Design a protein with these regions (language model features):
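Charge-rich, low-complexity N-terminal segments
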Residues: 1-126
Length: 126
């Protein structure tokens, strides 16, 4: 088994806010991330797949195709967007990094070919 990691970048805004809580509790728990006017980050997304290299190509999956898949289904939908408002697969969810990673996983996993398994995601927020 070998692993291939592709790194993609995007910029996006979001806020962490629980509507069932008071503004004071939201600020206590989420701090500046609960800002009513949102806040932005630069993100690095590491997508790692695993599999056995094809004997003819030496690839698990062509890295360019993996990049195109991630761009089409993830980064093009997230880049320069408000994650809470503009991204279908994040609507109605608390927009934490952890929930964003789960949503990205759910978007990517079924789109990969059977011979390339999604192994892990790493999302870096700066």
């Amino acid at each position: 088994m070998v692993y291939l990691t592709r790194i993609e970048h995007f910029n996006a805004a979001h806020k962490l806010y629980n509507p069932d809580w008071t503004p004071e509790k939201n600020e206590e728990v989420f701090g500046r991330c609960a800002n009513a006017n949102w806040h932005g980050h630069n993100f690095e997304l590491y997508v790692t797949i695993k599999g056995k290299p094809d004997p003819d190509t030496g690839f698990i999956f062509d890295a360019k195709k993996l990049g195109a898949l991630v761009q089409e289904h993830i980064t093009d939908k997230l880049d320069h967007r408000n994650l809470n408002v503009d991204v279908d697969f994040m609507r109605g969810k608390m927009c934490s990094i952890e929930n964003l990673e789960v949503a990205i996983w759910n978007e990517l996993e079924p789109r990969l070919p059977a011979f390339a398994k999604l192994h892990c995601l790493k999302l870096v927020e700066t």
